[in-house]
Structures are given as C-alpha cells and as structure tokens.
C-alpha cells in the first residue's frame, strides 16, 4: 500500500469555484503553482451534465479537495449539446470535449446527473456521444463514479438495465442502510446515514441483482437502491446527490413552484416544515467519506503509477 501524503486539489487558473473553496478552507492549488511540485497527481475528469455547471463544479471540487491526495481535474462537456445556463466563454476557458482527451488515460472519472431523466435514453440529444464516452471509460479510466442520471445511463448502457418512471418525484433527504460491510467504498460509513435524492425515475434492485457482475452496497426503504458497483470497483453507481449543498433542494423546490409545477416540499428537509428556512446539511460527513473512499481505494490504490502501463 502506498503511503498517503496530504496534498491539494489542482484546478484551472481563474476557475470561479476557486474563491468559494478558498473561503471554505479547502486545500487547492492552481495550475501555475502545481507545476513546481514534483509528484504525479491523480488525473480525474468530470463529465458535467448538470445545467448549473459552476455550482456543480464547486460541489465536486470541494469533495475532491477534502482528501489527502493531489488531484488534477479536467472538466468535460458534451460537444453535441449546447447548455442554456452556462456561457460559451466559461466552457471555452475551462472545459474540454471527449475528442480533446480521448487519447489520454485517467485515474478516475465522475459522470454527473442531468435533467433529462424523463426522456428515453435514445431521445437525449447527446446520447450517441454519451455511449462513446461510457465505452471509452472501460479502457481509459481506472474507476468511474456515476451519479443519478449518470448512474442510470451507465447501468443501461453497460448492463442493459432500464430505468423506470416513478408515480411521484422522489424528492428529499432519506435514510440509508448498508447492505454489505466488507467493501472498501463503505469503510467508516454509519449504519444509518442520510443523502438527498431528486429524480422522477428509478432502477429496480431486482434488475441490478440479476447481473452477476454487480452488487448492491446501500439502499433506502423509501428511495430504493442508493449505491451499487461492479465487483471489481471499476464502475460505481450512486443514485442520489450526496454532493448537493444544503440549499440545493430548496432552490429546486422554489424553481418548480415558480414554474407552476405541482410539487410537494422535499421530504425530511425543511426544519419544522418551514419552507422559508435554510435546512441543515445532514449528509456532509457521509458525502466526504463516500468520495474520499472512492478516490483512495478505487482510484489511488488501483491505478498504475504510469497510466500508460
């Protein structure tokens, strides 16, 4: 086992998330400073499919920066989709497409959720590109962490597991339990822990358990399967949003109300049911442990020192 040394996360110069993370005392390093350090950081790419790209960047970088490992992050977006909520200037400055990195290998990859879950996969306008990216991860990434719709897309493409519509939106903060205890990804997890969900579709436990290569790691009575993975750890599927900030569900609720969409307040979220109050962050410890375990045990401990090996 390699010795672990406290190291920062390396991010692009001038990325807006930098100032937020510095104020939160997250250990980060910009590119120009990182060049003076003679070590190999972990190469992590993030395929950011969320409409609120800058907020998602901050959420994920916060978690990756709270580990004792130096991480070099590349941000990716689909070239076949033009986001409405992110400027072209931001994308041009900080993002790459798969064509620009497909000859490279990465230690780890994160594929985010996306607001397209009610569409059939093949109706998503970047689905063909998405399948190419998922195929690419098999040969070019040591371990890939899929989140929410990203998890559903990965399960469908790699294993043929279909998502199923829910009668009502699964929306709130739910308790979860461990299904197994001798798996590195779950090291240090509480027996019961909380995480947010925000989705209109689900994947059934029975469908996952029919695939010999997969294992269910954590579940919720209300929310169903929460974490599943391939038995070799190369693919991890998280159905919820442990990366969310305390206010994220509140913003989603207020957005839907403003649009006139019938929507109940998030379950187990607002203090005493007061929708004007800022809820406490009940899942911070779980989220940090999930990402640090993935980064350490499934990426750092498994990746070759020379990525081309």
UniProtKB/Swiss-Prot annotation:
Q: Which Gene Ontology terms of cellular component type are present?
A: cytoplasm
Q: Which GO terms describe its biological process?
A: L-methionine biosynthetic process from homoserine via O-succinyl-L-homoserine and cystathionine
- Which reaction equations make up its catalytic activity? L-homoserine + acetyl-CoA = O-acetyl-L-homoserine + CoA
Give the EC number: 2.3.1.31
Where in or outside the cell?
Answer: Cytoplasm
Any S-S bridges, and between which cysteines? none
- For the site labelled Important for substrate specificity, the residues are 198
| Binding-site list for substrate | 169, 198, 255
One of the Pfam families matching this protein, by short name: HTS
Give GO MF terms, alphabetically: homoserine O-acetyltransferase activity; homoserine O-succinyltransferase activity
Q: What keywords were assigned to this record?
A: Acyltransferase, Amino-acid biosynthesis, Cytoplasm, Methionine biosynthesis, Transferase
Q: Where is the active site?
A: 148 (acyl-thioester intermediate), 241 (proton acceptor), 243
Does the record carry Acyltransferase as a key word?
yes
- Site Important for acyl-CoA specificity: give positions: 117
HAMAP family per UniProt: MetA_acyltransf (MF_00295)
**Database matches in NCBIfam families:** metA (TIGR01001)
PANTHER family from the xrefs? HOMOSERINE O-SUCCINYLTRANSFERASE
Primary role: Transfers an acetyl group from acetyl-CoA to L-homoserine, forming acetyl-L-homoserine. In vitro, can also use propionyl-CoA as acyl donor.
- Name-wise, this protein is Homoserine O-acetyltransferase
